[in-house]
Amino acid sequence: MTTYAQDSKLRLKTKIGADGRCVIEDNFFTPPFKLMAPFYPKDDLAEIMLLAVSPGLMKGDAQDMQLNIGQNCKLRITSQSFEKIHNTEDGFAGRDMHIVVGENAFLDFAPFPLIPFENAHFKGNTTISLHSSSQLLYSEIIVAGRVARNELFQFNRLHTKISILQDNKPIYYDNTILDPKTTDMTNMCMFDGYTHYLNLVLINCPLELFGARELIEEAEVDGAVSEIASSHLCLKALAKGSEPLLALREKIARLVTQKIQKD
């Protein structure tokens, strides 16, 4: 099988425009990346959709993403569709992402789920730098595979790392390793019969621990939430489809953004 590995770059820098809303100050991207112009669904909250004109990640693909959210910006970044990791044969596909959230800025990073196909190998590394006044809502959703085809946990390996620093001090680190060759993904300590996994982190967001627990109990998911450093929250949930997890995440995001815009 012939593959054409691609190194892709994305740069995005935002600032507050003349009308007091978040705008793009500078951007640069190489194929398959594209950025839609920001739109404003709610007052001063900007939304930018990240596009990837591609069927998915292949063997040798390497993505380099750098996002710089300017001071006082309120921004939600979404993706175009579910992200597919194809058969990477004897190699892997990777992504390095560096995010900086400025003073008094808010970022809601809300990509669609990641689907590793049979024999897919993916490595993801995300580093997020915050100020003490920055607010962050960051998530990833991982799927067991092409569930509709009953292709469950047939990928090779999936390894994602998330590191969050506040004023240059580490406050959160997540190291997710899913390796079906060495671990039974269906046991009760892993997916336990579920097929979709949500990992959500809230930093300086106006949502309390008990409020988050109530939202989990109301949703059609199996999940829990914990306090991490300085009363920030980490929420993890499992479901048998993407819809319940996306609905829970959207409900949390809606509550958080409503409170932020009132402040």
UniProtKB/Swiss-Prot annotation:
Gene Ontology cellular-component annotations: cytoplasm
Keyword Aminoacyl-tRNA synthetase annotated:
no
Which GO molecular function annotations are given, in alphabetical order? nickel cation binding
Which UniProt keywords are present, listed alphabetically?
A: Chaperone, Cytoplasm, Nickel insertion
Give the UniProt subcellular location, in the record's own words. Cytoplasm
InterPro entries listed in its UniProt record? UreD (IPR002669)
Q: Quaternary state and partners of this protein? A: UreH, UreF and UreG form a complex that acts as a GTP-hydrolysis-dependent molecular chaperone, activating the urease apoprotein by helping to assemble the nickel containing metallocenter of UreC. The UreE protein probably delivers the nickel.
Q: Which HAMAP family match?
A: UreD
What family name appears in the similarity comment? Belongs to the UreD family.
Briefly state the protein's biological role.
Required for maturation of urease via the functional incorporation of the urease nickel metallocenter.
Protein name per UniProt? Urease accessory protein UreH
